[in-house]
């Protein structure tokens, strides 16, 4: 088990090293998030979160959203979730418009000693209210995969983690390509049994319409009740 754990961590670390390419654009942003989750029953949980994201060297608002969802635990380590996100984001005309996003997840987690490995497969659809051309009138579909490894420090409230995320367009001319990747390393601070905070660094590479990179500092506060 320990050997498999080490191999898995090395695999994630390898994937978290961005491929060296010449990006046409490089940027920096800061993300701020607050989330809350509440167990309704042993198998049913509701979640609510809000997030504000900046770009252009953290000088301009990129998007802000609020999201609500529900998770059902089918088995001990497998669950399904559905959520809705209302976003106000900047568009090509430098003005802000609403977007509606609907998400369906299949989640899993595997504990291994002080480590916990988790991930999910997501199918999501987004609907724009900013219509620039004919394609904007129709929903866009995206598949997403996330893999995460966290080490639960036994005697200290700081838990380091890494994760990767990949986004792929679906049901379009761009199907079979990668839209963007995220590689992240961070630390979780356990404040109390029901409160925690996270600080993480994210490297995001967008491939469409051209290669562009953004370095992100993400700060999150989490509440469980």
Locations of the language-model features?
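Outer-membrane beta-barrel domain signature
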Residues: 22-25, 54-59, 91-97, 132-138, ...
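Residues that define the transmembrane beta-barrel architecture of outer-membrane proteins
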Residues: 28-30, 62-64, 98-102, 137-143, ...
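Bacterial Sec-dependent N-terminal signal peptides
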Residues: 1-28, 225
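Repeated loop/turn-to-beta-strand initiation elements of outer-membrane beta-barrel proteins
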Residues: 43-48, 77-82, 113-117, 155-159, ...
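Transmembrane beta-strands of outer-membrane beta-barrel pores
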Residues: 50-56, 84-90, 110-112, 123-127, ...
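Residues on the lipid-exposed face of transmembrane beta-strands in outer-membrane beta-barrel proteins
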Residues: 34-38, 68-72, 104-108, 145-151, ...
